[in-house]
Amino acid sequence: MKKINSILMLLAALIILIPTNACAQRVKFSNSSIVPAAEGAVKVRKDKNNNYLIKVNIDNLAAPERLTPPRQVYVLWMITEDNMPKNIGKIKVATKFLSSKLKASFETVSSIKPMRIFITAENDASVQYTDYEVILTTNNF
């Protein structure tokens, strides 16, 4: 009995000490009518400093120059808790070595909790407000 209790205590300690992504939220982007082949997801997790780590991965996202009308760059936005859009960076589309598959990824840290993530195609990556169509969006977290 003593041996079983020792083993259970050890297992409980390991479960507590092993870092996991259990606290991370993963939300897929909704299907896009503008770039229908694009698929991706956003993972958001709170770090030990109470900041939010935001990771975005997208497959089959066409280059913004191939859109109609063409644009220069994709911009990633988040909707904050006060329902305001915030530009959090640009996304570069590239092909992997020895592959024709277009991939895009993005990672940032925010002190503000994101409620929703969306992507627009813009002519300038530093825009603070968008007038253009949303290319991809998530549901609320």
Q: Regions from the language model: what does each represent?
A:
Residues 1-10:
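Bacterial N-terminal signal peptides that target proteins for export
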